[in-house]
Amino acid sequence: MATKTLKVTQTKSSIGRLPKHRATLTGLGLRRINHTVELEDTPSVRGMINKVYYMVSVEEV
């Protein structure tokens, strides 16, 4: 069975944010505004997205 993937896009800048939130964006592989990555839908990735929900948008692929 194929694994689900999520399309995560950074929508807001990380400037002036908490260092842990900036590190979370880096952990997700996001570098700049409008940068999009496709990640596996795992509990750890979901937790990282929940931490920075106000800076990213998520689509199920």
From Swiss-Prot:
One of its GO terms (molecular function) is structural constituent of ribosome. GO terms for cellular component: cytosolic large ribosomal subunit. Disulfide bonds: none annotated. GO terms for biological process: translation. SUPFAM superfamilies: Ribosomal protein L30p/L7e (SSF55129). Keywords: Ribonucleoprotein, Ribosomal protein. Pfam families: Ribosomal_L30. It comes from the Bacteria. Part of the 50S ribosomal subunit. Belongs to the universal ribosomal protein uL30 family. This is Large ribosomal subunit protein uL30.
